[in-house]
Amino acid sequence: RNYAELFTTPTFYRALLNTLLIVVVAVPTVTAFSLWVASAITPMHEAPRSFFRCVFYLPAVTGTVAVVVVWKWMFDAYNGIFNWALKSLGIIDQNIMWLGDARFAIWCIILILFTTSVGQPIVLYVAALGNVDRSLVEAAEVDGATKLQTFWKIKWPSVMPTTLYVAIITTINSFQCFALIQLLTSGGPQHSTDTVMYYLYTNAFTLYRYGYANAVGVVLAIIIALFSVLQFKTMNTGVEY
């Protein structure tokens, strides 16, 4: 009965679509940006490389409440830095309710999730790129390969296991996005930031529908497993550390 109700409830499908949007946007952007940053800072000397790693990793180790406080101020309709900057540039003439407008709220959540998710992948990619066989890179350079060719033919296959790990972890974290929504929007406005995880929480601990929430949890676990298997099948190249 719970599963029958679940798959006929529009609110669940809205939460599922929001969750899939977060995953589809966050996973490739976090992976690509992390690899790009790691590629840029890996050739640096130890001091600047360590500095940049710390800078990008800082949001990942900062408490969620502290992160939310900072971003809530930045998104504030009247005193926030985003509206101030856009007004100063003449892009807008009226304040935007970033977290109170269904058109923008989900993108604000994705942006915050992105900034808190890139730290660990950057550190992992720096380590992976540092382990790439230098003799292969030097041989490619001697043969006249461009930096782009060297990256795609040598470095990219070498960091594929790290990319697989980053993609799976980012997928799981995106599906489990909850604290940001709980503290920033509570699923609103108009369920525009409702996710499957938050939908599960609401039904379990607000409406006390434990059986229904359990059904939501089972469906969420199956979806995460399917995404993880798909990523493993498409990205696993047999390369080992």
What are these language model-derived features?
Residues R1-Y241:
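A structural signal for multi-pass alpha-helical bundles of membrane permease subunits
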